[in-house]
Amino acid sequence: SSRLIWVIDPLDGTTNFSNGLPSFCCSIALVEDGEPVVGAIYMPWPETTEGRIIHARKGGGAWEGGVRLQIAPGNKPVSGRVVVRGGFLPGRFRPNKDLLANGGQQRSIGSTASELAMVADGTYQYTLHGNPHSWDVAAGIILVREAGGTTLSHNKKGWYPLTTFKDNTLGGTQEAITQETLRHWQSPVLSGNPEMVGFVSDNLLPLPLSTRLLRGTKKALKLSRSNRNP
C-alpha cells in the first residue's frame, strides 16, 4: 500500500476508439489515502487540433487553459439540456414520476471520464453511471468537486458523498487503501451540482434485490436462447 497512488485510464471509450468514433479520452488522477486530489482528462475535440485538457487539484479549482470551470446551475434537470443515465438504470433503480417528468435529455457518448469532464465544464446537467471502475471516475471526481459540484455513490444503506474510495470498500474501516482495492472498486456514481444531485438521488428508488435477481435471470436466459438460435 501507499499514501499516493496514480490511477490512470490511458483510453476510456475503447469501443468508440476502435470503431473510429472520436468520443474517447485519457484520464489521470493522483489518489492520496483513497481521495482523488489531482486529476486531468484529455479529450480529442473536433474544433481543435490539440484537443481539450481539463484539470484540477484539491482546493485549486477546475480549469481548461486559463478559464476556471463552473458546474451547471439548477435544482432540477431542465428539458432540452443533456444528462447521462447509464443503461443499468432499469436493472437497479426505478425513477419516480418527478424524475420522469424532469429528467433532462439523455445523451451518452460512451466514455465515462469524458462525461464527467463535461459535468465539470457545465455541458451535462448531471451524469449517472451504473458500475464504473475507479479508473473511470477518479479524475472526474476531483474535476467535478473543484468546479463546484458533488459526487455520490450508492451502497445498501443508500446514497453517500463519494470523497474517497475508502467509503465503499471494506465498510470504510481499512487503515490504508491499496492498488488492489482500487483495482476492484466498482459502484454507481452520480455527479452534478449539489441541488441537482439531491433531486435525482431523492427521486431514484432502488429496486429490491429479488427484483434485480429476477431481471438478471431473465436477461441471462434471453441471451442464452439467442446464442443457441443465431
Regions flagged by a language model, labelled:
Residues 37, 69-71, 159:
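Short, isolated positions in well-ordered beta-strands
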